Amino acid sequence: MGCELAGAIKSVIALSVGISIGMGFGENTQAMLITRGLNEVARLCAAHGSDPLTAAGLAGMGDLVASCGSPLSRNRTFGEILGRTGSIETTREQVAKTVEGVASAGAVVEIAHRVGVEVPVIESVADIVNGSLTPEAALQRLMEITTKAENFIR
């Protein structure tokens, strides 16, 4: 279950990184999104009885780094265009390929809510994709999260 969760969630996190790049944010913002996203993967794995350290392996961190770091990633590319245009419709017109993170963001949020796990990065992407939040408002919301101890498994 951990590998499956990590695979679905990395696509959503790659969207968030792409959005931040498209909006002109730099590596610090990308690192924040990847780190918090990885923490969300680990917490969801733990809540579903999987080893949360799965998130630290190739199926988690490895896939996450590849998807978030590669300009060839469909999820990151979709996010970049969305971050530049601010329009989900325009982005869908420009990207005619399947983008897993767009389809799975809402479902991952539902899974997290069922088990009581907070997933602010994933939630923000789902809100952008469903049109209830602009990329600017979503990133602002994420930046306003108070800094606290981010234990990898909690």
Task: Describe the residue ranges of each PLM region.
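Ligand/cofactor pocket segment of small-molecule handling proteins
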Residues: E27-A31, T35, V41
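Flavin-binding catalytic cores
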Residues: G37-G49
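Flavin (FAD/FMN) cofactor-binding and adjacent substrate-gating region
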Residues: M1
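NAD(P)-dependent Rossmann-like dehydrogenase/reductase catalytic/cofactor-binding core
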Residues: E4, V17-I21, F25, A46-A56, ...
